Regions:
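Bacterial N-terminal signal peptides that target proteins for export
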Residues: 1-10
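General helical secondary-structure elements
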Residues: 1, 36-40
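Bacterial lipoprotein signal-peptidase II cleavage site
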Residues: 21-32
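A residue-level marker of the well-folded mature domains of exported/periplasmic proteins
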Residues: 26-28, 40-441
Length: 441
């Protein structure tokens, strides 16, 4: 009797508890993201995974804003160096919703720090780039004052750095090597001219890449090709550059000309004289329309955004960027529109690779050179080949004497073939012209 009453009571309690349970709200949805009151209703108990993901979303930190500030040493409009840097800032801002690009133009060395501090204080800049070494190096002096800001300076020959003072440069010599192959094949007189700025590590390194390409083309085709270099004295001296270009054509029978200067004068002379021009830094036909492929045989394009993207990616991951960033054709990034682009590449009228060779020039270039351009480009993209590793470096006896690093005597083999030079050596100690170059007074 007592046992029966007990069982009846127990049944009533169980039924009541089931009714109450069916009326109560589920406990898991109460922990779902409170910041999203319009979130979907809780999933049935059979799908518990959905309910356990929401708390992680609720605690996810917001993406920190990044303000990329570039200090340009020159004006932007109509320039290949600062123009390419400005394009880089715009492309990065297009790619990342949390990245803003700001800039200053015509920044002198004594202005780089005041401009930087102004952009940090008033516009939230946390990456500040000096796009030339002579006006980027002063930023090193304030790096300790702003530990949360990454300062960047382009390398000319000084590779000093700090945890938040980053040095960078692209391996433009790789694209210049490909240009040299094309130039060496195109010349009919056997004379190629370079209008150059002044002896410095950056100029010597870039010229060496071009020269090695010329010599490889000459060897493959059984030609004797000379490269004549004359210095203007600075990067932007339009009249001096014009005079040098005319001298190279008139006195040295140059029929292919290029430059390591910044004015359009050498291109103007090439157009007037009816010879081939090889461009630098940007696709001057496709980007600016300065000329046509009837004069510009090929150019190369520098994508500084690939370098700066390394810094942005590190910051977004909460990491410190590398202190020296020296990337080449093996490195790339995807733009906002899905385009994959290399750090540097030969480019002409919007076309890349062997397609960048002028349609007018292409029939004049033997197929074995076209094939070699394609092969070497693909090998460099894969990181399997590099002209500076492949070739020996033998001194011409000319170049730039540096403190503790005089120009090696003519005929001195400084680097053997197959030896990979260090990044530090290439960026700061490569101070001699390669054997066979004609450096004019």
């Amino acid at each position: 009797m007592h046992k029966s009453k007990f069982l009846v009571g127990l049944a009533v309690i169980l039924i009541a508890s089931m009714v109450l349970a069916s009326c109560a709200p589920a406990s898991a949805p109460a922990t779902q993201a409170p910041a999203e009151p319009t979130a979907k209703p809780a999933q049935p108990a059979a799908e518990p995974a959905e309910a356990t993901e929401a708390p992680a979303e609720a605690t996810e930190a917001p993406v920190e804003p990044i303000v990329l500030a570039i200090e340009h040493f020159s004006v932007i409009e109509g320039t290949t160096w600062s123009g390419a840097q400005d394009r880089a800032g715009k492309r990065l801002a297009e790619k990342y919703p949390n990245v803003t690009y700001i800039f200053r133009e015509n920044v002198a060395p004594d202005q780089s720090v005041p401009f930087a501090e102004d952009m940090i204080a008033n516009e939230g800049a946390n990456i500040v780039v000096g796009n030339a070494e002579f006006m980027g190096m002063p930023l090193k002096d304030i790096a300790d004052k702003y530990p949360d800001v990454n300062f960047v300076s382009i390398v000319a020959s000084d590779v000093s750095s700090k945890e938040n003072f980053i040095r960078t440069f692209p391996r433009q010599y790789q694209a210049l090597y490909l240009e040299g192959l094309i130039a060496g094949a195109l010349t009919e007189t056997g004379n190629i001219g370079i209008v150059s700025a002044y002896p410095n590590v950056q100029v010597i390194r870039r010229t060496a890449g071009f020269y090695l390409g010329v010599q490889d083309a000459a060897e493959l085709l059984g030609k004797d090709v000379k490269v004549h270099v004359k210095y203007a004295g600075d990067w932007y001296l339009p009249q001096e550059e014009r005079d040098i270009a005319a001298t190279l054509v008139d006195q040295y029978q140059v029929d292919v000309i290029t430059q390591q200067t910044d004015s359009g004068s050498p291109l103007d002379v090439a157009t007037e004289k009816g010879i081939w021009f090889v461009g630098k830094d940007m696709d001057i036909v496709g980007e600016y329309g300065w000329s046509t492929t009837d004069t510009v045989a090929v150019s190369f394009d520098t994508r500084w955004e690939v370098l700066y993207d390394q810094i942005i990616q590190a910051m977004m991951a909460g990491e410190k960027p590398e202190q020296i960033i020296y990337l080449g054709m093996e490195s790339s990034m995807q733009l906002a529109d899905g385009t994959d682009e290399l750090t540097v590449d030969i480019m002409n009228d919007g076309k890349l690779g062997v397609d960048a060779i002028s349609p007018k020039a292409l029939p004049l270039i033997p197929q074995e050179i076209v094939d070699l351009v394609k092969q070497r480009r693909e090998q460099m993209m894969a990181g399997e080949w590099d002209p500076f590793t492949e070739h020996a470096f033998v001194s011409n006896g000319t170049g730039l004497d540096m403190e503790g690093n005089p120009v090696p005597a003519a005929g001195t083999e400084v680097k053997t073939a197959g030896e990979e030079p260090t990044v530090e050596w290439l960026l700061s100690q490569f101070n001699f012209d390669l054997q066979g170059m004609n450096i004019l007074e």
